[in-house]
Curated annotation (Swiss-Prot):
Protein name: Acidic phospholipase A2 2
Active-site residues, Swiss-Prot/TrEMBL: 75, 126
GO MF, one annotated term: phospholipid binding
Keyword Disulfide bond applies: yes
Record flagged with keyword Signal: yes
Cleaved signal peptide residues: 1-19
Domain of life: Eukaryota
Function description: Snake venom phospholipase A2 (PLA2) that shows moderate enzymatic activity and exhibits procoagulant activity. PLA2 catalyzes the calcium-dependent hydrolysis of the 2-acyl groups in 3-sn-phosphoglycerides.
Transmembrane regions listed in the UniProt entry: none
Cystine connections: 38-104, 54-153, 56-72, 71-132, 78-125, 88-118, 111-123
Amino acid sequence: MHPAHLLVPLGVCVSLLGAARIPPLPLSLVEFRILIKCANHNSRNVLDYADYGCYCGKGGSGTPVDELDRCCQAHDYCYDDAEKLPACNYRFSGPYWNPYSYKCNEGEVTCTDDNDECKAFICNCDRTAAICFAGAPYNDENFMITIKKKNICQ
């Protein structure tokens, strides 16, 4: 066999190994997106919140730029508190990986009673944030602000 023929199977194996390491989308973040859409009556694309201000999206630092960014900061802190709960401290049970039950009825978000302690806490974090988002004005200038103004969130 020609050595070049070994490159194809090797490439496939390396690709499969790489794909196996791609993490799935955290489950409760999917639900959080649904709660945002429910509370906001689908008025905004949920991706508009993915990189807004200093706290909306992954991570967060500095001073929130406005009321909506403060909603995201409070949500981040709520998730931090969830990770400290004994009921949420084992692998795949924290705020990002723990799916919970909820209801959405005409813009009203309710966390259902069948959630355990950890799921109930996470659901309430997301519910509170979704309601906060619905009441806070959205300033287009603050979308992707960390790219527009490099040092604003330090």
